[in-house]
Regions:
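Gly/Ser/Thr-rich beta-alpha loop segments that engage phosphate groups in nucleotides
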Residues: 1-2, 43
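Flexible, glycine-rich phosphate/dinucleotide-binding loops
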Residues: 4, 48, 138
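Active-site loop signature of alpha/beta-hydrolase-fold enzymes
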Residues: 4, 86, 115
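Conserved catalytic scaffold of divalent metal-dependent phosphoesterases
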Residues: 7-98
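Binuclear metal-dependent phosphoesterase catalytic core
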Residues: 10, 33, 101-102, 115-145
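Catalytic PLP-binding core of fold-type I/II PLP enzymes
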Residues: 97-105
Length: 145
């Protein structure tokens, strides 16, 4: 979720190999298959007064690649974003349009914290968004399937 230490996927995978970690994978322009599901996603983008078009298009492209890879598996797709692309009346159309184009109907996300927002349920144009920030789920793992 807060992967500020991320450098490159190649370096991260080398670290896993060097340390013999075989139960961890990274989603970066791809998907991961886990227990009969294709897990897809990207960081996404949050609403700013001045959005950065370069970052926004990059994140939309990464989500497109990840969901396309997930579709190729033929498995049900679980979609995760760090930033929600829908929050209240705000919609990040560049990201949301990728989700709609791929027929995704449930997206899990983090980023939002605080007691007042934890009970907010978000749905937009047939897509449900579920907030999984640690403080909003009492620091308890959430069973999602």
């Amino acid at each position: 979720n807060h992967d500020l230490w991320w450098s490159t996927s190649k370096k991260l995978r080398e670290f896993l190999d060097d340390n013999k970690f075989n139960s961890i994978d990274f989603i970066f322009n791809n998907c991961a298959v886990c227990e009969g599901y294709a897990v897809a996603g990207t960081r996404g983008w949050f609403f700013d007064d001045k959005p950065d078009p370069k970052i926004l298009q990059r994140e939309a492209g990464r989500l497109e690649l990840s969901l396309s890879a997930a579709e190729k598996t033929g498995l049900p797709i679980l979609t995760f974003l760090h930033y929600p692309c829908v929050w209240g009346d705000e919609v990040c159309e560049e990201i949301f349009s990728v989700i709609k184009r791929h027929g995704i109907n449930q997206v899990y996300h983090g980023h939002i914290h605080g007691a007042g927002v934890c009970k907010v349920k978000t749905e937009h144009d047939g897509v449900k968004f579920r907030l999984l920030s640690c403080d909003c789920v009492d620091f308890t793992p959430v069973f999602i399937v």
